[in-house]
Amino acid sequence: MSELEPAAQRADDAAEMAALAETHCLSSRGAHATKPPFSYLHAFFRAMQEPYEPGTREDGYVVLAVAQNFLTVDTVQRRLALAMRSAQPETTAGYDNMRGSDRLRRALAAHMKRVLAPNHADGAIDPDRLCVSAGAGAVIDNLFMTITSPGDGVLIPAPYYPAFDNDLRVRNGVRAIPVAGADAESLPTGPALDRAVEEAAARLTGVRALLLTNPSNPLGVVYAKRSMLCAARWALREGMHVVVDEVYASSEYYDVGPFVSALEWTPEDVLGENPADAADVDADAGGGSSWTLEDARRAMATRLHVVYGLSKDFCASGYRVGVLSTRNEQIVRAMDNVAYFCCVPGPMQFAVAEVLEDEGWVDAFLEENSANLRDAHAALTAILAEGNVPVVPSSAGMFVWVDLSAHMKAPTWEEEKRLWTACFEDEKTRLLMTPGRDCRHNKPGCFRMCFAAVKREALEVAARRLVDLLKRYE
């Protein structure tokens, strides 16, 4: 799964969509929108009808396939409810700037500068360069509408967030191109990215962007600044946009390696003037070595974009608040238009701004949330370790990436599906995980376990069920 779908599969999909469009009076775009965003959606809905409940439904399903954080949600809800009480109808009931009220963008700019990027290259984040939408997904949808055209491709280091394929394709007609690194924990380097572009050339109109996520979903690792810059430098020198998704930036629970936001990158970083980067520039330069500091500055001003949101770090996936930071004035102008279709409701903007302005509360909450994430991660991985289940060491986000390939008869996607089905269908297991194939991993047998959306007892039950199944799986 490290390349685009085979031609035969694409032809079958096209025929199916054409038939669906004709039968149900849909456009081809509407027909494609009827496809589920990932393969396990049916299982999710089924599991939610019979969830595990201690004492009342002990044989219920445990869902560890959704990247949500409910561990500290009560703290957030209490503070937001307090903020909502002071919202004034005359300031929140009418139209406002569709890409975010002035107050919300100022609050977000201050928060992002203080928490995500204290060493921001410009000294401050300009609120006028922030574009707020109803969640990071809407931000990405709008952004790629402005920087790509139907038939274009976007490079994404794999494994990656399983909904990216749908997020790029369903409205904008853009294809995700998975690119594997040297191992599951590494970002691809210049040669691997070059090969991915060459392989996609015959199928796509062009490759327009590189989409990075740091910290990683599904791995839960924090990529080093140097690794991120290697990939970004290559793309910027090739004339591509670089989009950095940082929605897990404040969800670190182990201080393994410091998270460095792309908001802190400088033109010198992108150019590679630091002597420590010299080897990386030689190996991954892309576009030749004739770049100047002014070229790097211009590339950052027009083609480097950072996505952030409150869904993950603030246990607020239902509140739908995401933000784009870009220096490209024309993208901001386009967002003024398209943000109308997905703007955040006025009362929510008011409440979120008030909460973010309460810096003492924010700091205490983030500390509490990190502790809760750390405890949940430790509880899950301790049981997996007892069962000799290999995992990628993670330090951020809400995921554990497990490798169950040793329990498969063969290293095939069919065997991965059989193991995934056993986890879900076995009456003693009834566990829903994200299959690695949906994350476009290149090795069958790996799964994502999301540990922050269920209570501790359910999490531990799920881990023990998995270990028990693996002992008897054939």
Model-found features: residue ranges?
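PLP-dependent enzyme catalytic core of the Aspartate aminotransferase-like
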Residues: S2, A110, A124, A299-M300, ...
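N-terminal small-domain helix-loop-helix segment of the aminotransferase-like
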Residues: A8-G135, A192, L356-E359, R472-E474
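Conserved core of the PLP fold type I
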Residues: E90-R237, A249-D277, S289-E294, H305, ...
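Short Gly/Ser/Thr- and Asp/Glu-enriched loop/turn motifs at secondary-structure junctions
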Residues: I125-P127, P393-F399, N442-P444
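Hydrophobic residues in well-ordered beta-strands that form the structural core
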Residues: I156, P178, V244, V352, ...
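Helix C-cap/helix->beta junction micro-motif
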Residues: R237-E238, G387
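PLP-dependent aminotransferase class I/II
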Residues: P275-D280, D284, S289, L293, ...
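Conserved PLP-binding catalytic core of the aspartate aminotransferase-like
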Residues: L373-R374, G387-E427
